[in-house]
Amino acid sequence: MLFSSLLCVFVAFSYSGSSVAQKVTQAQSSVSMPVRKAVTLNCLYETSWWSYYIFWYKQLPSKEMIFLIRQGSDEQNAKSGRYSVNFKKAAKSVALTISALQLEDSAKYFCALGE
């Protein structure tokens, strides 16, 4: 059945910190991809911080937040299992790629910026 072989990924973005100089945005609101394929979720940010981290989380239907991966501003591209990050500091862009998609990957994804 075609529907059961597709998953939906909803993208939402947030930031942490006390200053309005920190901002996280996205262009994708939802993505549908077949299982076993890969999907890339984009996150653009603005910050005045010299050193910072970008975190990716997945929110389950139960509203539970699951930490996926962290990217440091002075680190090489992060990778953890099926999750990998393409970090472009000069472009203020960080993209999360999820490989070998599974139906369990259907969720809302959050990109967060913190010190």
UniProtKB/Swiss-Prot annotation:
Indicate yes or no for the key word Signal: yes
Question: Residue limits of the Ig-like domain?
Answer: 22-115
Where does the record locate the signal sequence feature?
1-21
| GO annotation, cellular component aspect | immunoglobulin complex; T cell receptor complex
Disulphide-bridged cysteine pairs: 43-111
The compartments listed are: Cell membrane
**Keyword field:** Adaptive immunity, Cell membrane, Disulfide bond, Immunity, Immunoglobulin domain, Innate immunity, Membrane, Receptor, Signal, T cell receptor
Q: What's the subunit arrangement here?
A: Gamma-delta TR is a heterodimer composed of a gamma and delta chain; disulfide-linked. The gamma-delta TR is associated with the transmembrane signaling CD3 coreceptor proteins following the stoichiometry: a single gamma-delta TR heterodimer associates with one CD3D-CD3E heterodimer, one CD3G-CD3E heterodimer and one CD247 homodimer forming a stable octameric structure. Upon activation, gamma-delta TR complex associates with FCER1G to initiate intracellular signaling.
State the PANTHER family in the record.
IG-LIKE DOMAIN-CONTAINING PROTEIN, T-CELL RECEPTOR ALPHA CHAIN V REGION
What name does the UniProt record give this protein?
Answer: T cell receptor delta variable 1
* UniProt gene name: TRDV1
